Amino acid sequence: MKILVVEDENSLREVIVRSLEKERYVVESASSFREASLKINDYDYDCIVLDIMLPGGSGLTLLKELRALRKKDSIIIISAKDSIEDKVTGLDLGADDYLTKPF
């Protein structure tokens, strides 16, 4: 399984990547909207772990673009935004799950 972790906070991104690699997943990472967009366009992922607030753009915009392209990647949002409205918005846009930070 190939996973893309999109998170701008370096230490959190590294912890997530290491944890997934320890479970023997193939993991790549991106720290900005642009870097994530390029990787998503160039590679197929089975799962994308996606922060909402990114330098250069919103993770929700990436989510909308992925779903508009009918990409079937599993998408898990990770965000410090923890209101019911934020969670409903993410799930309504096509996320498969929504996890709040810290976790």
Which role fits each region the language model picked out?
Residues 1-103:
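N-terminal/domain-start alpha-helical segments
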